[in-house]
């Protein structure tokens, strides 16, 4: 457990002098732990200075904040610092973005100011929660989109160097956090570089790793073919990716079929999520598709099943070319000998299902690539907190179960704490993020393991 805190500095760190200072002439190479990127210290930084209303978070009605937008390598980054900086730095790693989206830029209209309009942007909401509590906050847009785990780990880790330049001082403590794919990035950095971080926070993170993420969407693709044959022209395990317009048409047809006759989709939902019974502490497993327990009627219930299907299918159908390119032209998925089972299915029904699911062979080079980018070990030296929704259709419970088992196997359970929230969806609210962050900070500073609030 990292307890390298010292008393907080009493004076706020002033960065105004840095805004007019060139650190060197020409391009620099920023390097940290083998990661590197070019940096122009004389670039035209966009500097925002303003007041943030922190009264909703128990702070002052007008907190002075300085924000800086810069570029490192091929990616934009943001650093925010409150005038009453407490000395700690929080890094944020964003989640997956479809490969047809532009890389290297944030997905909102810059500048991200300090008025009410910032609440319309997820990053603005998180920034407000963090900065209003005295922390500095930094985030990278990543050089690339798609399954950019490698780029995300590099660009987020290098924020350690860049943020220090803008803050004007070495942070007392540094916390790395992220959502979904970004949660995997945050935990991966915590595993590999515990000397750089004091704690890590993952929300809905892919903590089972990228091989498990591929298994999810690739199993879903094969099972979709068994229940809805012929709707997709390309064969499982091959491209091309669909255009956004083509996927929208596909999604509309799936939704219409499901509402007209939900029996097929309900039957598909009763398939046991592949391999989940081996990870479930109770040995039961989870359904392939979740329904929203809070759905008010049958139409909404079927709609939640449709969303549970289309989420993973969008990851596959819109990004299959990106996955193939990163995996040296191959897939890391193999179901040639996998036996699909169902809840309350007869042996004959399961045999019929297995006969209808297309079979795919894994490419060893693709397996190797995704093992390195990234397969978490669960071996921890610093506190790690994870927020997970029990009915997450994008990052199912198997990821949490897998990571908890890895932490136990490596003797790291004392460094890992999961906050399980009973709900449907792939999100944590900004308030939940802040609650978990403050609990993580207390854990690091005092050694007190978090006790999570009971959710309705």
Give the ranges of each region predicted by the language model.
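Short beta-strand/loop motif that positions the catalytic acidic residue
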Residues: 386-388
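Catalytic-loop region of hydrolases
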Residues: 23-128, 363-364, 448, 454-456
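Catalytic nucleophile-loop/oxyanion-hole region of alpha/beta-hydrolase
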Residues: 139-158, 167
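Histidine-bearing beta->alpha loop at or near hydrolase active sites
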Residues: 415-430, 441
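Primarily recognizes the serine-hydrolase "nucleophile elbow" in alpha/beta-hydrolase
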Residues: 173-228
């Amino acid at each position: 457990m990292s307890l390298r805190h010292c008393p907080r500095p009493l004076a706020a760190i002033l960065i105004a002098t840095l805004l007019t200072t060139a650190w060197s002439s020409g391009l620099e190479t920023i390097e940290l732990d083998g990661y590197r990127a070019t940096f122009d210290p004389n670039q035209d930084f966009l500097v925002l200075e303003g007041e943030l209303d922190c009264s909703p978070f128990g702070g002052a009605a007008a907190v002075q904040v300085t924000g800086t937008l810069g570029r490192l390598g091929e990616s934009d980054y943001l650093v925010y610092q409150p005038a009453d900086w407490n000395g700690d730095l929080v890094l944020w790693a964003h989640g997956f973005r479809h490969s047809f989206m532009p890389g290297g830029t944030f997905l909102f209209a810059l500048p991200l100011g300090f008025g009410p309009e910032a609440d319309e942007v997820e990053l603005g909401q998180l920034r407000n929660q963090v900065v209003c509590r005295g922390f500095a906050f930094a985030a990278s847009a990543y050089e690339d989109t798609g399954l950019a785990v490698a780029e995300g780990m590099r660009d987020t880790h290098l924020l350690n160097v860049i943020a220090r330049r803008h803050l004007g001082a070495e942070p007392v403590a540094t916390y790395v956090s992220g959502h979904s794919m970004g949660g995997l990035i945050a935990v991966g950095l915590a595993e590999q570089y515990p000397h750089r971080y004091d704690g890590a926070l993952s929300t809905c993170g892919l903590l089972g790793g990228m091989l498990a993420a591929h298994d999810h969407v690739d199993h879903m693709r094969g099972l979709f073919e068994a229940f809805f044959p012929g709707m997709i022209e390309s064969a499982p395990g091959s491209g091309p990716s669909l255009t956004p317009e083509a996927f929208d048409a596909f999604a509309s047809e799936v939704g219409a079929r499901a509402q007209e006759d939900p029996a097929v989709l309900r039957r598909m939902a009763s398939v046991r999520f592949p391999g989940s019974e081996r990870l479930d502490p109770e040995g039961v497993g989870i359904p392939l598709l979740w329904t929203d327990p809070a759905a008010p009627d049958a139409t909404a219930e079927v709609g939640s099943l449709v969303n549970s299907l289309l989420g993973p299918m969008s990851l596959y159908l819109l990004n299959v070319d990106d996955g193939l390119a990163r995996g040296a032209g191959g897939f890391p998925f193999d179901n040639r000998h996998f036996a699909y089972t169902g809840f309350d299915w007869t042996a004959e029904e399961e045999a019929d299902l297995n006969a209808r699911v297309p079979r795919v062979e894994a490419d060893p080079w693709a397996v190797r690539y995704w093992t390195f980018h990234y397969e978490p070990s669960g071996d921890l030296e610093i506190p790690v907190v994870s927020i997970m929704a029990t009915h997450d259709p994008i990052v199912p419970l198997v990821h949490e179960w897998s990571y908890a088992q890895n932490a136990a196997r490596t003797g790291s359970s004392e460094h890992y704490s999961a906050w399980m929230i009973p709900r449907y969806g792939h999100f944590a609210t900004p308030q939940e993020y802040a609650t978990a962050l403050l609990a993580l900070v207390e854990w690091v500073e005092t050694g007190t393991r978090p006790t999570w609030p009971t959710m309705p």
